[in-house]
Regions:
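Extracellular glycan-associated modules
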Residues: 1-298, 302-304
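Asp-box/BNR beta-propeller blade signature and adjacent active/binding-site loops
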Residues: 290, 298-745
């Protein structure tokens, strides 16, 4: 069932061809609300306003639509949001309702193609088309040449001789493991100079360079089981990309196509140019003069579409950006999605950031409106913030627990001061302009360092009232940046506060924040904060949340956990795997860590069947692999740090969740951004069936912009993935088990 099920709305479909940036379509109303979809910097761009919100959305992953070839475009719009499809597959979505009903009076849609842009086959549909219906309406790309024999004709070979970029498609199979050979080859003057093969290493594409050296591009894997496979080699934009069965398997810098073949006079399939044949067969193949996009390649392989809905994005509830997803399915079946709401600028702290949630009562098909759960005063870079939520549920009583970082105004991880900022009871320690310290008591009163009463009282939101001689006057706000309020009297410590909030009614109402620094932070730490995403509840009942913190050298961090054996009433910090670690021949510890190569940052946790706890960690080790360690005592101590050879690391947040079934109780799925392109991108999901000891399959979910993510298993057993495109927003996708199971090779 589509995520749009149950919503009425509208759809539009068309085809366009563009050679230059310019307008495509727009919707106008008499009160100046409306929107326009156009091409900017060779990518789609949507901007405008509805009765509910304004938006400006850069669909940067649609780059190169100005290639002069025909593309299909579809838009669906409902009160739950809108989706944009390019060449049959969803390329973007937004919380904005793009339908005429959501804009002003007499809103009408117009085609507005600019110079150098053609539009045809425009249709308006009085219903929300499903992803499958849109795919069926989208034609496959037209090849320059299709193979009808083992050799191309001389005329067709000549057509290829000047192509510096383009796409190769072939459907092949071999006769079983260990049987390999050439899928396609090309040469000139009796010398083979281009070859596409299935080998022991995987799919290999190589081109003979000008200096007589082979330039080799390999997608590592085993596609020799005897099944039919589609292989696509896409060459352009400075890279060679290799797809198998519609999914990106390798993105490799460098560009080499048929124009690199000196005196090209022969192109063959199912054999090399000497006649040595593939141990199998090529059923069909085609060559394209254009660099096909991800959607077009998926269309060639009949990939089933994944339905995605935007839950938080730029403009939603008047905020400039949302980032940092958290996601959980509760015992009741309610699904809770959390996000940082960045009101005026998109940056991390220091910034005005709120914690917000949306909830689903039908397994992620529909979502309620935004709830602002936790907010602090101030605006912009001077505003106080909460950031990086991490969520867990206590299954014993249903309590939903979230740990989150709080910074006062003007403070973030880079400039936070060392210290706790609270007393042994978790009460804020305040200071005035002269450095005198005070305690903010639970009843709102303030006492000085000796416990004496003062003229100050403080409201729950931090507003200070000064009462002298029976007269009240404002005293600023303790959470604001220093110097912002002319009435400033008292401020909290300029440090990081790890805080907890909870809900006992599935996220409908929430507690206020509780400070945890007194239990888990040390005076020498300026930062001690969550690893955003998901925590775990062990079978023993212990709640465990991944964290990381810095020491004497503020730029270097160590991963750890905090844990609670009483449902969140009290917390303890476990040791870091960096404490006592032998690194490059010397013993290190988390307080004095002075090398980034040994640092461990945001982490994710999995409890295994044997009770051990696996932690997978973001890092900048030269290996370029995700760091890992195992605890046998519930996170109190950790074993040696090692690196997961199967998991690429580009210094980005990881997330993992168990996905067990009766026949595979230790199935785990892991996700991260796995490649710099040069931006952070290529979101990949990986599958383990032994609790994360080995990783047997992987599949690229989004080949371009992709940063943080959080996952949960939904009530119907499918995977819910809440993921981000850096600054654009957070998107929810439902992924069936067979999607990742099909990647097993």
């Amino acid at each position: 069932m589509s995520i749009d099920a149950g919503h009425t709305g509208i759809s539009w479909t068309l085809q366009f061809r563009a050679r230059i940036d310019g307008a495509l379509i727009e919707l106008h109303s008499t009160d100046d609300t409306g929107w326009r979809l156009f091409i900017r910097s060779s990518a789609l761009f949507l901007e405008g306003s509805t009765n509910a919100m304004s938006f400006a959305l850069d669909m940067e992953d649609t780059a190169s639509v100005t290639d002069g070839t025909w593309h299909s475009l579809a838009i669906t719009a409902t009160s739950a949001g809108s989706k944009i499809f390019l060449d049959g597959y969803q390329c973007f979505s937004t919380t904005a309702d793009l339908s005429p009903a959501a804009s002003g009076p007499e809103a009408t849609l117009k085609l507005t193609p600019g110079a150098g842009i053609d539009i045809r086959s425009f249709t308006e549909h009085d219903a929300v088309l499903s992803p499958a219906e849109i795919l069926a309406l989208s034609p496959a790309p037209t090849p320059l040449i299709e193979f009808a024999a083992a050799h191309l004709s001389d005329y067709d070979v000549a057509e290829l001789s000047e192509l510096t970029a383009g796409t190769i498609f072939a459907r092949y199979r071999v006769r079983g493991p260990g049987q390999h050979g050439t899928i396609l080859a090309a040469g000139g003057g009796g010398i083979e100079q281009l070859n596409l093969s299935v080998t022991e290493e995987g799919i290999e594409y190589k081109v003979l360079g000008r200096r007589g050296e082979w330039r080799t591009f390999t997608a590592h894997g085993h596609w020799d089981q005897g099944h039919w496979h589609d292989v696509v080699v896409r060459v352009g934009h400075g890279a060679v990309q290799i797809y198998v069965d519609g999914y990106l398997e390798a993105h490799l810098p460098g560009q080499a196509f048929f124009a690199a073949v000196d005196s090209l006079d022969e192109v063959v399939i199912g054999q090399d140019t000497s006649g040595s044949r593939l141990f199998g067969e090529v059923r069909n193949a085609a060559l394209f003069s254009s660099v096909l996009n991800d959607s077009q390649i998926k269309k060639l392989s009949s990939v089933a579409p994944v339905d995605t809905q935007c839950l938080f994005d730029a403009g939603f509830h008047d905020s400039i950006s949302y980032r940092i997803p958290s996601l959980i399915t509760l015992e009741s079946g309610v699904v809770v999605a959390g996000a940082d709401q960045r009101e005026t600028i998109a940056n991390d702290s220091p910034n005005s950031i709120n914690f917000t949630v949306r909830r689903s009562f039908d397994g992620g098909h529909t979502w309620g409106d935004l709830q602002t759960v936790l907010t602090y005063p101030g605006h912009g870079a001077k505003g106080a913030s909460v950031i990086d939520s991490c969520v867990v549920q206590d299954r014993r009583n249903g309590r939903l627990v979230i740990l989150i970082d709080h910074f006062p105004g003007g403070i973030g991880q880079p400039n936070a001061e060392a210290g706790l900022g609270v007393d042994a009871k978790g009460r804020y320690i305040l200071h005035d302009a002269n450095g005198a310290t005070y305690t903010w008591n639970e009843d709102g009163s303030v006492t000085d360092a000796d416990g004496n009463a003062t003229p100050f009282t403080i409201s729950e939101r931090g507003d200070v009232t000064v009462t002298e001689d029976g007269q009240e006057s404002p005293g600023g706000n303790v959470f604001l940046a220093d110097g912002v309020d002319p009435h400033q009297t008292l401020l909290t410590a300029r440090t990081c506060f790890l805080q907890m909030i909870y809900s006992d009614d599935d996220g409908e109402t929430w507690s206020g924040p509780f400070n945890l620094n007194q239990d888990v932070k040390e005076e020498w730490m300026s930062f001690c904060g969550t690893s955003p995403g998901t925590g775990v509840q062990l079978r023993s009942g212990r709640l465990v949340i991944p964290i990381y913190y810095n020491g004497d050298h503020k730029r270097h961090f160590s991963a750890s956990v905090v844990y609670s054996d009483d449902g969140g009433a009290t917390w303890k910090r476990g040791k870091s795997p960096n404490d006592g670690r032998i690194f490059e021949g010397r013993e290190i510890d988390s307080r004095t860590l002075d090398t980034e190569a040994a640092a461990t940052h945001e982490a994710t946790l999995i409890e295994r069947a044997d009770g051990s706890l696996l932690m997978l960690m973001r890092n900048q080790h030269p290996s370029g692999k995700v760091a890992a360690t195992v605890s046998t005592d519930g996170g109190e101590t950790w074993g040696d740090v090692f690196f997961a050879e199967e998991i690429t690391e580009i210094f980005c947040q990881p997330n993992a969740v168990p996905w067990p079934t009766d026949d595979c109780p230790e199935r785990v799925v892991f996700a991260n951004a796995s490649q710099m392109r040069p931006y952070r991108g290529r979101g990949v999901l990986r599958l383990s069936e032994d609790g994360g000891r080995t990783w047997i399959a992987s599949r690229t979910f989004n080949p371009a912009h992709y940063v943080y993510q959080c996952m949960t298993i939904l009530p119907d057993g499918t995977l819910g993935l809440l993921w981000e495109r850096e600054m654009q927003g957070l998107y929810f996708s439902r992924i069936p088990l067979e999607w990742i199971e099909a990647a097993k090779i």
